[in-house]
Amino acid sequence: MVRFFGLNKKKNEEKENTDLPADNEQNAAETSSSNVSGNEERIDPNSHDANPENANNDDASTTFGSSIQSSSIFSRGRMTYGTGASSSMATSEMRSHSSGHSGSKNSKNLQGFKDVGKPLRAVSFLNPVKEEESQDTQNTLDVSSSTSSTLATSGNARENSFTSRRSITLEYIHKSLSELEENLVDIMDDIHQDVISISKAVIEAIEYFKEFLPTTRDRIPYRISLEKSSSLRKINKIVLHFLDNLLVSDAFSNSRSILLRRFYFFLKKLNLITDDDLISESGVLPCLSVFCIGSHCNLPSMDKLGMILDELTKMDSSIISDQEGAFIAPILRGITPKSSILTIMFGLPNLQHEHYEMIKVLYSLFPDVHMYCVKDYIKKAASAVGSIPSHTAATIDTIAPTKFQFSPPYAVSENPLELPISMSLSTETSAKITGTLGGYLFPQTGSDKKFSQFASCSFAITCAHVVLSEKQDYPNVMVPSNVLQTSYKKVLTKESDRYPDGSVEKTAFLEEVQRIDQNLNWQKSNKFGQVVWGERAIVDHRLSDFAIIKVNSSFKCQNTLGNGLKSFPDPTLRFQNLHVKRKIFKMKPGMKVFKIGASTGYTSGELNSTKLVYWADGKLQSSEFVVASPTPLFASAGDSGAWILTKLEDRLGLGLVGMLHSYDGEQRQFGLFTPIGDILERLHAVTKIQWDIDPQLDG
């Protein structure tokens, strides 16, 4: 067995039939020809040792003969000379054969010793050099023929390695996975019982991965699935437990990297990581990521996990207490989606050692479900502005532009009376809180005269925590955000003070400040709208957090992203694909969605099949959520109210899935949203009017 710093388990020596390094294909192929036994012989019946007569003495003759002519750093010349006692495995007949051919005194003196150390040498086990000891001149003449023999042997070894890989059976692979699982389970039991240190345990785990299918360096000719292999799921769980829970300290960073890299090659060998995956082989270490539980996920325990979380949300909040924002997120975790397993992520704003101890207690709850805890929490996606957000867009032309073009850190419209969706928004008097204009809703009053006054009205929608105020019942709203414009103005004014009076730079900054002032004054004279209703409450264990804003009749309201928003990574978001044309009531797990927030702009993700459970406002709540993909960012402060959208498959245009209200504040990879169906249902219950994303047709 290949040893890592000389540490390994004794029981591994008893279980393994071969002692092969997994990182060297040629050595593995050469060693397998002389040392294979048990299962490996059954896998490769066409091995070069098929001749019984030759096979009987192959081991001994190879070891014996290889010491006679080989390259050595201890000999005076390029070739070494036989000792007559090549190995303790040599038979008495072979030793007498050696004595008959050797005329040196040293050979006779060393014949009686069985454990004489041998010099380092490069040998071929498939075609051993026969023992021929003669004068130095004869050895010199034999160098050419010996080299040719070694080259031919290397080619045969490589060919036999490919033959052995082709002959590996699926039964043998599953047996090897089962053995690896047993070894790793034993290690984990020893860790939890404090029998072995984590440092030694991870070294042994790495060694076990090295010895998995040692004769196969590349991919196996089969495809192993996590759904059908319980051993593979358990192996994944143990490795993730190492990486996420046991090796989180900086002291284990090197061990963590080695184990992760070894695990990567293990998955690649099983075809769970393909060349099409985003993991490069340029020396950059792979990393663990989170993925959504999609509609194609058929892993065992998924239904049971969903039932547990559903029951948890029904519990009485009065008997539960936790840190504000703490959450439980059911997800997939691994290197790639195809190689990931079911995972329960515990997010806690104040992570302590006792939480890791809790994970150890829960470790055996599910045999193939990974659990880990991170410093993270759920928070509202409104922004309490302390600095300017990084998202930039084109400038608004309310006055003549300056010769120096500035790009404010918020989206603006080419026409101030035609405001597209997803722009920044705040109340007129707000000094800190800012969010995103989700879109527009239109009441469907029909022929009911009681609601005829609302028939031609347009209403904007955003999160209630963005615009509701205790100081004012029906505040006026500004788009773009008054908070962002005021903050941007302060930054420019402060920067202008660094330049001398009359300089070109200071003049440019002051002109931009003047332009912002004029735009703010225009917005106050041409009010966008006023909040008429909103609520932030728990209804049926679900958060209802939205408000509707009656828009001034001088504004033209359309559910479109607008042509002024140009920073889209998706090139297909053009023309008809800029317009929201349908409501999506039936959400498919794994559906690809995106949002355009006032803070982070365009980000994409996938819908998770199971809801996230979190503790907020003294109550246990649940919510649908999006897992960021392919980048690990989905939402941040200032994105509250942004619509969750998807591209329609059967026609051009966008579908409305829901509205963002929260995100995980530390890692920002989850976006919590309210489905559009729930929003419209709640609005109908409150107003007694049907609502839609399209204006009511006359007649």
Swiss-Prot record:
InterPro entries named among the record's database cross-references: Peptidase_S1_PA, Peptidase_S64_Ssy5
Active site: 465 (charge relay system), 545 (charge relay system), 640 (charge relay system)
Keywords per UniProt: Cell membrane, Membrane, Zymogen
Bias (Low complexity): 52-78, 97-109, 144-154
GO CC aspect terms: plasma membrane
Membrane protein topology class: Peripheral membrane protein
Span list, region Disordered: 1-113, 129-158
One Pfam family of this chain: Peptidase_S64
Compositional bias of kind Basic and acidic residues: 39-51
Biased composition (Polar residues): 24-38, 83-93
Post-translational modification: The propeptide is autoproteolytically cleaved from the catalytic domain but remains associated, forming an inactive protease complex. This processing occurs even in the absence of signaling.
SUPFAM superfamilies: Trypsin-like serine proteases (SSF50494)
TM annotation in the entry: none
Compartment list: Cell membrane
Membrane keyword on record: yes
Inducing stimuli: Down-regulated after extracellular amino-acid addition.
Quaternary context: Component of the plasma membrane SPS (SSY1-PTR3-SSY5) amino acid sensor complex.
Protein name as catalogued: SPS-sensor serine protease component SSY5
Organism placement in taxonomy: Eukaryota, Fungi, Dikarya, Ascomycota, Saccharomycotina
Gene (UniProt): SSY5
